Curated annotation (Swiss-Prot):
Phylogenetic classification of the source organism: Bacteria, Pseudomonadati, Pseudomonadota, Alphaproteobacteria, Hyphomicrobiales
Enzyme Commission number, as recorded: 5.3.1.24
UniProt xrefs under SUPFAM superfamilies: Ribulose-phoshate binding barrel
Protein name, entry field: N-(5'-phosphoribosyl)anthranilate isomerase
Organism encoding this protein: Agrobacterium fabrum (strain C58 / ATCC 33970)
Keyword Isomerase among record annotations: yes
Stated family: Belongs to the TrpF family.
């Protein structure tokens, strides 16, 4: 079974068209100004129209206030809100009530002890995104090109639905799928030639590997 594939940090029509054509289930736009993948909501809204109906549009925010969320929801019309900051369970409930949209909560993972951070959000978040904890000194909560020990996820309750993120690329995606029960994969830096610059050849290479894996015994 082919996992969901979310390509995050899209900024151009060419890369958006390519990931949708190759079969991305989700396309992510980042609304965090410190990120090299940041995009203005009005531009993201125009790009999102090209993906509408073919892939789910995900708005990625980091501790955004209501005014900014209002702008994003109005201009982008996302299918999903991804909260990648320190938003509390109460904040998630408030956001879900305000916008009536599914919420994916990002949880930063370095070791097994970090899995405990998932528990307070169970029953509130519609899905989780398990990302590698940012290296010391990084201003970015995600997109740092680092991964974590995926074997620690074996202890995670099977009821927890999650996308796996952090340092994924064509060279390790098969291992990630074999080692975890992730229902989806989230990539950003793994399909880039430079921070914030998506590479069409890397996008193609990644989808080639995923498609080959999905056809094999493990994906049958």
């Amino acid at each position: 079974m082919k996992p969901d594939i979310k390509i995050c940090g899209l900024k151009t029509p060419e890369t958006l068209e390519r990931v949708v054509r190759r079969g991305a289930s989700h396309v992510g736009f980042i609304f965090f100004e410190k990120s090299p993948r940041y995009i203005e909501p009005d531009l993201a809204g125009r790009l999102a129209e090209a993906a509408r109906g073919a892939a789910k549009v995900v708005a990625v925010t980091v501790d955004a206030d209501n005014d900014y969320l209002d702008e994003i929801v109005d201009l982008v019309r996302p299918d999903i809100l991804q909260l990648h900051g320190s938003e509390s369970p109460e904040r998630l409930l408030h956001i879900k009530a305000l916008y009536g949209l599914p919420v994916m909560k990002a949880i930063s993972i370095r070791d097994a002890a970090d899995l405990a951070k998932i528990e307070p959000y169970i029953g509130i978040a519609d899905r989780f995104l398990l990302d590698a904890k940012a290296p010391a000194g990084s201003d970015l909560p995600g997109g740092n090109g680092v991964s974590f020990d995926w074997t620690i996820l074996r202890s995670l309750d099977e009821s927890v639905d999650y996308m796996l993120s952090g340092g994924l690329n064509k060279d390790n995606v098969a291992e990630a799928l074999a080692e975890t029960r992730a229902s989806g994969l989230d990539l950003s830096s793994g399909v880039e030639s430079a921070p914030g610059v998506k590479d069409l050849s890397k996008i193609d290479a990644f989808f080639d590997v995923v498609n080959d894996w999905s056809k094999g015994p493990k994906g049958a």
